[in-house]
A protein has these predicted regions:
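Long, internal low-complexity/basic segments
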Residues: 1-6, 13, 17-18, 43, ...
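Active-site segment of extracytoplasmic enzymes that catalyze sulfate/phosphate-ester chemistry
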Residues: 10-11, 17-96, 100-106, 134, ...
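Short, solvent-exposed turn/loop segments enriched in Gly/Ser/Thr/Pro and often Arg
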Residues: 13, 23-27, 42-65, 73, ...
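Substrate-binding rim/cap in mid-to-C-terminal beta-strand-loop elements of soluble/periplasmic
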Residues: 62, 135-152, 272-276, 280, ...
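Formylglycine-dependent
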Residues: 73-103, 107, 115-214, 218-261, ...
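C-terminal cap/loop subdomain of S1 sulfatases and analogous C-terminal strand-loop tails that border
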Residues: 122, 127-128, 133-136, 297-307, ...
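Histidine-centered active-site microenvironments of extracellular/periplasmic hydrolases
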Residues: 122-125, 132, 194-200, 277-332, ...
């Protein structure tokens, strides 16, 4: 094994807010292994994703680009795969951090959910490739698997399968002279129907039989959720997959919420097994372990169930965007950091830890986390977007701006004072005394997207999106009937 460069193990969960992990303060969801990882490393309390949908976030993590730069504004819809080019990789035209690791001598593995195009062949500089052909999880069981050059169906739970395959990969690397990067994007806890509909049947089901769900807010459904559902009905012609009913039905389905909790514990269990494998293989002391999620998930906060696009206009409230982020390993200080962190920071931070060349370019907005100092980070604001909604967040303010154009219904903006209103309940956007603050934040927002967006993918400037958007009729109304998505 190369002692000069550490192995890097990146865990990513699917649809998990920091709120639903033990070490972030949740006393109902049992995650002892993630909690131990945090105890032995650096936990970031203010880490945020770029977009609260699967595919855009995964693309941002790998490339260091915002959705308006890489062009993926929504989850890539599996139902449209027949329209995608052969072997289509949605970020294939961009540089990515695994390719920089490979140039530095790393052996790269992806073991888990990909959701960035056609997955039948390995891409993005991964040598070892075990994934699904699909992005959405309809069930955790009986899934088709792509295992390098083989395909087969696996009967058991997919999280346990990816755990076992990661352990096999580590076993295979014990005597290797080159370091490895292993990306393990689990496809849970997920949170959508039909995968979590009803009582759980996994090994942690009984753990939550009597869970009171006191950490789940009890709020009425937000009107914006109903508006989103109505839009989906209109866009689809009246027929919708069952998963889209979840935001309306989850509030009264305790079995599904307990199911979601159990899937989080199953991921935690897998992480514990993988870390134990590193330990008994004498590899842990030279491995940096990272835990994060693609984006958050709202379990009733503000009356929203799901994530960003569960509401219309989209929600950019904290539960959908605040992600867990934990680093543990050699050279990393133990502690808790309140520094503002974007998932865009992951790419160059990992490359820095590996002493590899950084991602560069006019659209790349990756900074480097100082993992030796819990209070040192050079980002004093961060940016988020969800198609028609864009936001700037700093230590004091969250300002959300909506796309506005003549002929469209005005969707409004939102302003929250985070010092006085952590839960983002009191919208100050109509306050006369806050007009100057809104003006200043709006200017900063515009300047950022002028610099870090790619015109052809900037929806607010008439650009397009790859594969699909959530509300195509909205963008056709904005830019004309000839406006289309692209591949």
């Amino acid at each position: 094994m190369n002692k000069n460069r550490p192995n890097i193990l990146l865990f990513m969960s699917d649809n998990q807010s920091a709120d639903f992990i033990g070490c972030y303060g949740n006393y109902e969801v049992k995650t002892p292994n993630i909690d131990m990882l945090a105890q032995n490393g650096m936990r970031y309390s203010s880490a945020f994703c770029t977009n609260a949908m699967c595919s855009p976030c995964r693309a941002s993590v790998l490339t260091g680009l915002m959705p308006s730069a890489h062009g993926i504004h929504n989850w890539l819809d599996d139902n449209l795969e027949s329209q995608w080019p052969d072997n289509w990789n949605a970020i294939g035209e961009f540089d990515n951090f695994p390719s920089k690791l490979k140039e530095a001598g790393y052996s790269n593995a992806l073991i888990g959910k990909y959701h960035l195009g056609k997955a039948w062949k390995s891409s993005d500089a991964f040598d070892h490739w075990i994934t699904f052909p699909h992005g959405h999880t309809k069930s955790f069981y009986k899934n088709k698997i792509i295992d390098n050059d083989k395909t087969y169906e696996h009967e058991g739970h997919s999280v346990e399968f990816f755990t076992d395959k990661t352990i096999e990969f580590i076993d295979d690397k014990k005597k290797s002279e080159s370091p490895f990067f292993c990306f393990v994007p689990f496809n849970g806890p997920y949170g959508h129907w039909p995968s979590i509909k009803g009582k759980p049947v996994n090994k942690f089901a009984e753990l939550y039989n009597d869970c009171k769900l006191d950490t789940v807010p009890r709020e009425g459904i937000n009107k914006r959720v109903i508006d989103r559902f109505s839009n989906r009905i209109l866009e689809s012609g009246g027929s919708l997959p069952e998963q889209f009913a979840g935001p309306l039905l989850l509030p009264n389905n305790k079995d599904s919420i307990r199911n979601y909790f159990s899937q989080a514990s199953l991921i935690d269990d897998g992480i514990g097994k993988i870390i134990e494998k590193l330990k008994v293989s004498s590899m842990l002391e030279n491995t940096i372990v990272i835990y994060t999620s693609d984006h958050g998930f709202s379990l009733g906060n503000h009356g929203i169930w799901g994530h960003g696009m569960a509401a219309w206009p989209s929600s950019i409230h904290r539960p959908s965007f605040n992600i867990p982020l934990i680093f543990s390993g050699p050279g990393i200080t133990k502690g808790v950091s309140e520094a503002l962190v974007s998932q865009l920071d992951l790419a160059n931070t990992i490359l820095n830890l590996a002493d590899a060349k950084k991602l560069k370019g006019g659209r790349v907005d990756s900074k480097i986390l100082n993992l030796a100092d819990e209070n040192s980070h050079n980002r004093n604001m961060l940016f988020m977007e969800q198609e028609e909604s864009r936001a700037i967040r700093n230590e004091r303010w969250l300002y959300i701006e909506r796309f506005n154009k003549e002929g469209l219904n005005y969707l409004g903006c939102e302003l929250y004072d985070l010092e006085e209103d952590y839960d983002e309940r009191n919208d100050l956007s109509n306050s006369a005394s806050h007009k100057n603050i809104i003006s200043s934040l709006s200017i900063q927002l515009s300047k950022y997207y002028d610099k870090f967006s790619e015109p052809k993918f900037n929806l607010w400037a008439g650009g397009s999106a790859k594969s699909n958007v959530s509300n195509p009729s909205f963008w056709k109304k904005a830019w004309g009937s000839k406006w289309e998505t692209t591949n």
